[in-house]
Amino acid sequence: MKNVDSDDLVTGTLPKLKSSKEWLEPKPLCFMEVLAKEDTEAAIQSILYKENSVIKELDKYLQHHAFLNARRKEMLYKRWVDCVADPLQKKIIEKVCSHKKIKKRRQGELDGFLKHVNKKGNAFIEHYDPKEYDPFYMSKKDPNFLKVTIPPFHDPLKKAQYDKDNEKRTLLQCETGKIYSIKEFKEVEKVQLHSRFPQISNSRHFITPNEWLKLPTRYIESEFCRRRRLKVKVNFNDCSFDLKPLARAPYLLESQEEEKTVIYKNKGSSFLEREPLCYQEGNNPSAKEAISEGYFSSLSLSQEREEDQDGSPSPRLGLLKLEL
């Protein structure tokens, strides 16, 4: 059948028409296999044709893409040669070929330097200008070299105090018309605080605890400090002690009355303030000198002996009780 079809295609004649009997007769199995095989071959041929056409188009696209990449590289290289390579090569050639000019210029600079040195004359270390040349520049210590600045530390627990200081500083700036930093404001506030009190020399009024610890011992053991330590303020009129429950104990009342008499006799405490702190050989030290110079123990023992002999307390002992 295939040959018949091919002959028909070659000769160009029409195939013979089949009768109805031929069409209605059952076809053999081999004929059906031949038809199926022809159909599969036709489908395979069409698929192969399409595949060949796709491969050809893909090859054409890849060739075109490779051509474009090569052309792009050529254009980039040409641009690099025109903009970079050629100017750099020209400059290198000029520098290499201009060694004669370099020698002439170097010789001229050397001649100028020698003329300048000859004009200045001899240079000594005692006579030099630091603006021109300073031989001690490297040995000097620059105070601004590697200077580290740390921002001020703001304690969150003292935020209320910081806000209050900022408000006061703003008010002071509005009053004076001058901008103050925190450090300057603290100094002004310290001066204003000290101006409210009378200035007392040799006192702890203007001394902080850290400064007080740094003071020498001769200031603490001075005459003024000793006098200040001996002063005691006592109010003899006020008494918070009730004496009524002690009326049944006469011996306690008698001892209290004796102490009162001693205190009233030695009431004038100005004697201690007026009497100078001095100790001479051959004189008995006073109570104040005994406390300052370390004679308090011997004096108290002698006064206790006198009290035991006379039966009444000595006036010096009452004076010491008042001062302590």
Swiss-Prot record:
Xref: PANTHER family: FAMILY WITH SEQUENCE SIMILARITY 228 MEMBER A, PROTEIN FAM228B
Top-rank taxon, per record: Eukaryota
Protein name, entry field: Protein FAM228B
Similarity comment: Belongs to the FAM228 family.
Gene that encodes it: FAM228B
InterPro entries according to UniProt: FAM228
Protein species of origin: Homo sapiens (Human)
Lineage of origin: Eukaryota, Metazoa, Chordata, Craniata, Vertebrata
